[in-house]
Amino acid sequence: MALLEVRALRKDFPIRRSGEAVHAVNGVSFDVEPGETLGLVGESGSGKTTVGRLLVKLLEASEGSIVFKGTDITRLSARAFRPFRASAQMVFQDPADSLNPRLTVADAIRGPLVSLGHMDSRAQQARVRELIELVELDERNLPMYPHQLSAGQQQRVGIARALATRPDLVVLDEPISNLDPMVRVGVLNTLRDIQEQTGVAYVFISHDLSTIEEVSHRVAIMYLGEIAEMGTTELIFARQMHPYSRALLSSVLYPDPDVVVPRFPLVGEIPSPINLPRGCFLAGRCPLADEHCRMVHPDLREFEGGRRSACHHAEDVAAFKATHAENTVDSH
């Protein structure tokens, strides 16, 4: 049984003056198994961070279900969700903003343990020391305040705080994007080690494809609030079956000379999330699009190996030979 089952998830943000809405998440469905990492990747505005916040009920869903450990948490009140809070945590993009500047490292990590209400002071202190070691910090950091730490140390504190209650799921929202390259490597290695030791599952949100490839067991690529393509990391990076996936990967320069993704142009404006097209959201930019694409919205269909693609021409994507000079996912 999956740890997390997301079905037809939607999130709209109403615009009061016009009566319209920003359609941020549009019918997203996926599972997360215990101990796995699902990489959620997309450009700015794709809806990936909104999905992450929905998973831990920092936002309320407009429609759909999020079944976590057998319970649909979208139907729970804040009070009813409280027992699940310990099992689903989030690490945020900017560690400085997510840490209270008035709390020491020890107090920041201890906070979730206090909220649990069933650990005495000695047990809390022991758990804090255990967590500091787990995220590869030193006990000398415990009395420090956030401003006395480096960005990498701050993010490690954020990770320790998220792990304090022994969660089954941690949503990582761009956890290394604000860090220096060498620090990123260290934090990623720590996250991998923690997963191996604890069996925690991650939803790893990022715009960085190389990072997603490195850390994820499976990948879901998002475009305009929906999943364009999803599958194992190996399948997605070896051969794409959605035009947006192929364009996204072909726009990335890989340090490995053996990794070559043929050019694939997407030309034109990205549709407004307020007035989404009737058919495929990519039809106005895709060289494979026809009248059927413009009129009928594609479902996320399953293919060999468990891969899924929301494209009417999924089988033709890999074979398409680009003849255009453009090679970018956001050319206008």
Cite the ranges covered by each PLM segment:
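P-loop NTP-binding/switch modules centered on Walker-like glycine-rich loops
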Residues: 179-261
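Conserved ABC transporter NBD signature motif
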Residues: 64-72
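Conserved ABC ATPase signature
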Residues: 145-149, 153
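ABC ATPase NBD coupling module
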Residues: 17-19, 73-89, 107, 115, ...
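Short catalytic/signature loops enriched in Gly
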Residues: 16, 21, 232-332
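Conserved ABC ATPase "signature" region
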Residues: 72, 122-140, 193, 249-250
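Conserved catalytic motifs of ABC-family nucleotide-binding domains
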Residues: 166
